[in-house]
A protein has these predicted regions:
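Vicinal oxygen chelate
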Residues: 1-6, 10-19, 38, 59-109, 130-135, ...
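A cross-kingdom feature marking solvent-exposed beta-strand/loop segments within repeated
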Residues: 44-48, 80, 123-124
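Core segments of cupin and vicinal oxygen chelate
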Residues: 16-69
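Short catalytic micro-motifs in class I SAM-dependent methyltransferases
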Residues: 12, 31, 143
Length: 157
């Protein structure tokens, strides 16, 4: 049967944030995601129990789309209850291949975000590039990279 559903398909990552508009300055304006949908979450939202959110808090949700990946990222804003700082060591990250790594780094710095020193990237298949870790205003880690060199071909016998 040609229409069999695959056993798994990645739908989206979600980060919890304290100020959706501030977060969009980074995710939309610097990284280039588009806001596809935004809404206040209902009081019986599944997000409350699965994220262990105080039921008295108000939630707002934004779905973000990349150029060729619809609804691949979400931001959930929690208002009305204080959030503890993000735990260290960091337990999650999103990893993004970006076309303009220097522009993203400059934009993150303009927003006052923590930007880790750039490192040389070496992939498992021998490609090389650049990578930089950026921590958003809520302590969520975003690792950006760009490939600058291709793997060298193995000599043929």
């Amino acid at each position: 049967m040609g229409n069999a559903k695959p056993p798994v398909r990645f739908q989206r990552a979600n980060y919890v944030v304290t100020d959706l508009e501030r977060s969009l300055l980074f995710y939309r304006d610097v990284l280039g995601f588009e806001v596809e949908h935004q809404h206040d979450s209902p009081a019986d939202s599944y997000s409350y129990p699965v994220f262990a959110i105080d039921p008295s808090a108000q939630l707002r949700f934004a779905l973000l789309t990349a150029q060729d990946q619809r609804r691949v990222m979400a931001l959930t804003e929690i208002r009305g209850t204080p959030l503890p700082p993000a735990a260290l060591p960091r337990r999650a990250a999103i990893v993004l291949d970006v076309a303009d790594i220097d522009g993203v780094v400059a934009g993150a710095r303009r927003l006052g975000l923590q930007v880790h020193p750039e490192e040389r990237l070496e992939t498992h298949d021998g490609r090389t590039g650049r990578e930089v870790g950026i921590v958003d205003a809520d302590g969520n880690l975003v690792v950006i990279y760009t490939i600058t060199g291709v793997a060298s071909a193995e000599p043929t016998a």
